[in-house]
Design a protein with these regions (language model features):
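Short N-terminal helix/helix-N-cap motif within the alpha/beta-hydrolase-1
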Residues: 86, 133-136
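A short acidic, Gly/Pro-enriched loop at the edge of an enzyme's catalytic core
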Residues: 111-122
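A short glycine-rich, Lys/Arg-flanked "PGG" loop and its adjoining helix->strand segment in the class I
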Residues: 136-148
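Short glycine-centered segments of the SAM/dcSAM-binding site in methyltransferase folds
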Residues: 55, 150-151
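Class I SAM-dependent methyltransferase SAM/SAH-binding core
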Residues: 55-112
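Conserved class I S-adenosyl-L-methionine
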Residues: 1-51, 65, 69, 169
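A short SAM/SAH-binding and catalytic strip from SAM-dependent methyltransferases
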Residues: 122-134
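C-terminal alpha-helical "lid/dimerization" subdomain adjacent to the S-adenosyl-L-methionine
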Residues: 9, 25-29, 153-209
Length: 213
């Protein structure tokens, strides 16, 4: 199975189902990874801080979990990007259920998003960096399409030897691409042009919030 079809597997179906249920996702994360996902859902409030008429890019959008913060008729451009056709289909169903008319779905790689330079106010990058073959390049692409002072909010798994759970995060195994370490993420962010990123960690999960300088 190719990587872009990985989420068509039973794992992808299960992952999409529990990601939409914060209580269940938190229980699974605590049990399997020893981390707390509350910050993931809390950080989605950044969507409501974007000014009227602003643009949000959600890459990878997955099944569209972050759409929970959008209201029908809201005057925002929301661009949901993913490489997985199955995830985009699930996101479409979520869009239709919620009656969201201003969400655009795009199938694209995280290092080649078809939007102009400096066109985006908020970039969401949830649970994607550890899946990408070049996560540092994905952050450079996020910086490219963000406006000066634009905001990046996201989460990722980080590899390391701090715990047995972290040792399970191995490059090119399952849906992992080239996951970075806890030290790599702030370094990659700063190299891409983000200033003073706020980093929080829970087990092997790392949450980041940064502005483009």
């Amino acid at each position: 199975m190719s990587r872009d079809d990985f989420y068509a597997s039973p794992f992808g179906v299960t992952y999409s189902a529990y990601a939409e249920r914060p209580w269940l996702n938190r229980l699974i994360a605590l049990t399997v990874w020893g981390g707390d996902t509350r910050r993931y859902y809390e950080s989605m409030s950044a969507i409501r801080e974007v000014a009227d008429g602003g643009t949000i890019v959600d890459c990878p959008c997955g099944a569209g979990v972050a759409l929970r913060e959008l209201d029908p008729g809201e005057n925002l451009r929301y661009v949901a990007v993913d490489l997985s056709p199955s995830m985009l289909r699930r996101a479409r169903k979520r869009i239709d259920r919620r009656g969201l008319s201003r969400v655009e779905l795009i199938r694209a790689d995280a290092t080649g998003i078809p939007l102009p330079d400096g066109s985006t106010d908020l970039f969401l990058s949830y649970w994607g960096l550890h899946c990408f073959p070049d996560p540092a390049a994905a952050l450079v692409e996020a910086a490219r399409i963000l406006k000066p002072g634009g905001r990046l909010v996201g989460s990722t798994f980080v590899r390391g030897r701090d715990s047995l759970r972290q040792r399970l995060i191995r490059p090119d195994v399952g849906d992992f691409g080239k996951p970075g370490t806890a030290e790599d993420i702030p370094r990659w962010l700063e190299a891409a042009g983000f200033s003073e990123p706020q980093i929080r960690r829970s087990g092997p999960m790392l949450f980041f919030d940064a502005q483009l300088a």
